């Protein structure tokens, strides 16, 4: 196997490019119905999910999805102590391809955060990244990528070889949009 068929990232950000408050809480101002429908619709076709210890996608299917849980608390890889379908993975100790092979799935990998996880996959290489924007303000929060807010999330994606492939309005009343980013 070696790599997923595709690596897709999903994030909704505030005006400042934040995905959560400083204390790692995703506020209600980012939990918008239209974006949640888009997000869970995308996850429906994913073979597995990648997330950090403090984040997950929620929803009724979350517990059943195979997943890579990125952590620095182990040297390489280990079975998740509470989830037989999950693998703890330290990117500093093991290549992504080895972790993916050990997960024993094939298909799309959906990356759902948090900031360090989104940043790690910038280097591994997203095939697609769906960046939703909400008009919420979260000053001094947790950024979607390293380097935000000094740079915009869009600038970070561009610096990693991604190009905008169009923006869709998810909900005009709440001013929520999603931009699809793909390889240049």
Task: Go through the PLM ranges and name each one.
Residues 1-184:
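Enzymes that bind and transform nitrogen-containing heteroaromatic metabolites
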């Amino acid at each position: 196997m070696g790599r997923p068929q595709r690596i897709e990232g999903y994030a909704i950000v505030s005006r400042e490019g934040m995905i959560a408050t400083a204390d790692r809480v995703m506020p209600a101002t980012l939990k918008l119905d239209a974006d949640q429908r888009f997000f869970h619709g995308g996850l429906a076709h994913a073979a597995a999910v990648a997330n950090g210890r403090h984040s997950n996608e929620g929803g009724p299917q979350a517990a059943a999805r195979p997943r890579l849980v990125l952590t620095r608390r182990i040297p390489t890889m280990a079975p998740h102590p509470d989830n037989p379908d999950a693998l703890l993975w330290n990117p500093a100790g093991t290549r992504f391809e080895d972790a993916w092979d050990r997960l024993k799935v094939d298909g799309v990998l959906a990356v759902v955060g948090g900031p360090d996880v989104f940043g790690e996959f910038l280097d591994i290489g997203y095939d697609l990244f769906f960046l939703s924007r909400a008009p919420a303000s979260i000053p001094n929060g947790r950024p979607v990528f390293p380097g935000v807010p000094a740079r915009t999330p869009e600038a970070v994606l561009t610096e990693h070889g991604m190009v905008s492939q169009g923006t869709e309005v998810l909900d005009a009343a709440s001013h929520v949009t999603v931009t699809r980013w793909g390889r240049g």
